[in-house]
Amino acid sequence: MIIDKLTIFGTDNIGIYIFTNDKYTIVPKNLDVETIQKIQETFKTEIIQTTIAKSFLIGIFVAGNNNVILLPRNVDDEEVKKIKDIARDVRVEILDIRPTALGNIILTNSYGALIYPELSSIEFKKIKESLQIDNIEKGSIANIITVGSVGVITDKAGLVHIDTTEEELDKLSKLFRVKIDTGTVNFGSAFIHSGLIANRNGVLVGSATTGPEILRIQRAFSD
């Protein structure tokens, strides 16, 4: 398991710019070669350089797992084609629901999903149909309803908001079928998604993440 620090466009909030699963990593266009190389070495994935809704904020707009990449309704045709042309062995679906910040409202791996609780029943049904998993429910983490912003879950492990209770951790572990721990990133931020990206091969954290935080992250994601 590789753990490395990264800065993107001069910020430690690296998670807002990148989506990854175990096969593909979507990054902004115009990212420098050195950064792309570090991402590729860490995640061991194929890199897709694009925008989403003409924005570099890939991690905010995209959600998904090893079976499907979910794109917001405001994505344009060229962006969809770019992703579909490369990510040929996963489904790529446009999610026609009101919110577009899918990375903030959907927390998922290949086994389960936790969804923003204020979605309508129709929107919930659309997400469930797109993910094609039964283990899906609405909820919050540490009283925060934008569940995607406070957690990162892979098919091996997960890290969530530091204030998550033991009872919540137990429920989350059962939902996602992986071990889950609590922690922080970037010198005390509990919004894990903003400063951490992970798949089964490695973890990248914002460069402000401290030694003790990295030790905790390492423990959470190690085999």
Curated annotation (Swiss-Prot):
Keyword Transmembrane included in the entry's annotation: no
Origin species: Sulfurisphaera tokodaii (strain DSM 16993 / JCM 10545 / NBRC 100140 / 7) (Sulfolobus tokodaii)
SMART domains to which the protein is assigned, alphabetical: eIF6
GO BP terms: cytosolic ribosome assembly
GO MF terms, alphabetically ordered: ribosome binding; translation initiation factor activity
Keyword terms, alphabetized: Initiation factor, Protein biosynthesis
InterPro entries per UniProt: eIF6
The name this protein goes by in its record: Translation initiation factor 6
Similarity remark: Belongs to the eIF-6 family.
Lineage, highest ranks first: Archaea, Thermoproteota, Thermoprotei, Sulfolobales, Sulfolobaceae
HAMAP family registered for this protein in UniProt: eIF_6
Pfam families attached to this UniProt entry: eIF-6
Protein's job: Binds to the 50S ribosomal subunit and prevents its association with the 30S ribosomal subunit to form the 70S initiation complex.
